[in-house]
Each structure stands twice: as C-alpha cells, then as structure tokens.
Amino acid sequence: LGFLEKAAKSESPFMMYLAFNAPHDPRQAPKEFVDMYPVESIALPSSHMDMYPYKDSIGLGKKLRDEALAPFPRTAYAVRKNIQEYYAIITHMDAQIGKILDALEETGKKDNTYIIFTSDHGLAVGHHGLMGKQNMFDHSVRAPLILVGPGIPKNKKYKQHKLFSLLTNY
C-alpha cells in the first residue's frame, strides 16, 4: 500500500505485480476468517466420494499426491474442514485485494489503472473424491481471468476460446 501512495504522487505510469500464496497449501487463514465458515454449515459437493475410485488403476495408489492432503477414505468432516479452510483463505485474500482497490480509489488512480486477476488452477476440495489440483475436472482447470481498466467493457463475459483475441484487443 505504501508503494501505491508513493506512485500516486508521480505522473509516471507504474506497474505492480502481486503473487498471493493463497489459497495454496498450507491454507492458514486468520481465525476470524475461518470462523466465517462454520464446518457444520458447509455442504458436501454433489460429486463427493470417500475414495477416488481410479487412483490404483492410473498407477498411483498411495503415491497420488492427493493422498497427502487428506487420507482415504475421506470423511464428511475432513472434506468440510478442507472446504472451510479453502473458503477462509480465499476470503482473507479477497480482503487484501480490497485494500489495494481502496488505495487505488483513495489515491485517484483507480480509473487510470488496469487490473488483471487470474489464477493458475483451482482445487477439488472434495469433488470426485479428490482434494487437490492434479486432475482435469473443471473445478481444477477453469481458472478465473478478470480484466478491469480504461477501455475494457464492464460486465462483459468471454468464452475460453475467445481468450486470445480478447488479450490481443487490449
């Protein structure tokens, strides 16, 4: 935030790159964010399974990295606890991003700033008997890409196949 305050005093353009660790493991959000998501109120994913049925047939068995995130069989409590931690760390990260957006507003730079938000992957957190990212289900591979800034239409959604032309237009 100090950088934004300093950059706001200059007429020169600036670039700021932030790489949040969240929500990667270990997912350790402050308690106030964890408490926002009581375990007992979290629904299990509709595709929840206690076991990932293909771990042995794909030749991984106990070597499946997912096994380290929560042992099989996956209890309802273990899945809910993982979801709670995932939601909490994302909410905490969102609060930090909010501070940056507030600082851009307060310094008068918001309307002249491009913001690009993306992620490298999602997590299964209980879907299909999995917890991690090493799979090709939508929850793991459909990462967000949000662009905001001068000349970028608001509330416009693009399909994945149009991503390249979207990026070359801006």
Model-derived segments and their meaning:
Residues L1-L166:
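Active-site-proximal cap/lid insertion segments
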Residues T168-Y170:
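Feature captures the catalytic ectodomains and active-site-proximal regions of enzymes
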